From Swiss-Prot:
In vacuoles called myrosin grains of a certain class of cells, myrosin cells, distributed in the cotyledons and the axis of the embryo as well as in different organs of the growing plant. It comes from Sinapis alba. InterPro entries: Glyco_hydro_1, Glyco_hydro_1_AS, Glycoside_hydrolase_SF. Homodimer. The active site is at E125. Keywords: Glycoprotein, Glycosidase, Hydrolase, Vacuole. Belongs to the glycosyl hydrolase 1 family. PANTHER family: GLYCOSYL HYDROLASE (PTHR10353), THIOGLUCOSIDASE (PTHR10353:SF231). This is Myrosinase MB2. Substrate binds at Y51, W173, E180, F181. Glycans are attached at N30, N216. It catalyses: a thioglucoside + H2O = a sugar + a thiol. It comes from the Eukaryota. Its main location: other.
Amino acid sequence: EFFHGWYMEPLTKGRYPDIMRQIVGTRLPNFTEDEAELVAGSYDFLGLNYYVTQYAKPKPNPYPSEKHTAMDDAGVDLTFKNSRGEYPGPVFAEDANSYYYPKGIYYVMDYFKTKYGNPLIYITENGISTPGSESRCERIADYKRINYHCSHLCFLSKVIKEKGVNVRGYFAWALGDNYEFGKGFTVRFGLSYVNWDDLNDRNLKESGKWYQRFINGTAKNPVKQNFLRSSLSSQNQKKRLAC
């Protein structure tokens, strides 16, 4: 509620979540009747970003309430590993806490449908970074990114069919590299490859070619689950071994 509820409750009900009002108290401003009427139902669609799932555990607040941040008030500590040192899902690069949990996108979409009345949703970002230490061959083969997008699209397709979630679009993050918060250019992104030492060396990665086939297949054939499942086969592992 201190994350999505902070803005979703006002957008749908014209007020902050009950638990926020209880914990934050007078430090949380109230909506006037006019403000509540103005903001409730004022959105056209929701743009949701999903990358990964984290564990949460209670976190005491040692500071006076007037010095609390939103995270302090939430009273939780988000972690990559549980008490047994386990990640929620498969690990790509443990030194960078790089893992994925594709079923999480199913739960998130179902949660938004159930709690907020099945709003119109676009997945505005979904993707993963890969280690900057990979070789050129590994970057172009890009089997990790294929597995990531494929597995998430499988669960996204599943929740649309099973739960009737109103998702109308999906944007793979990202087309090329970007400067990542806290990591700079030490990790790589993108469906396309660019050699920073030779900008004429540019190639569409295997992940980009795969995404092209997926998009084209989706437009021509509404039944795409078989394509998604077949993409999670040993073919990607063969590409990895070839490098």
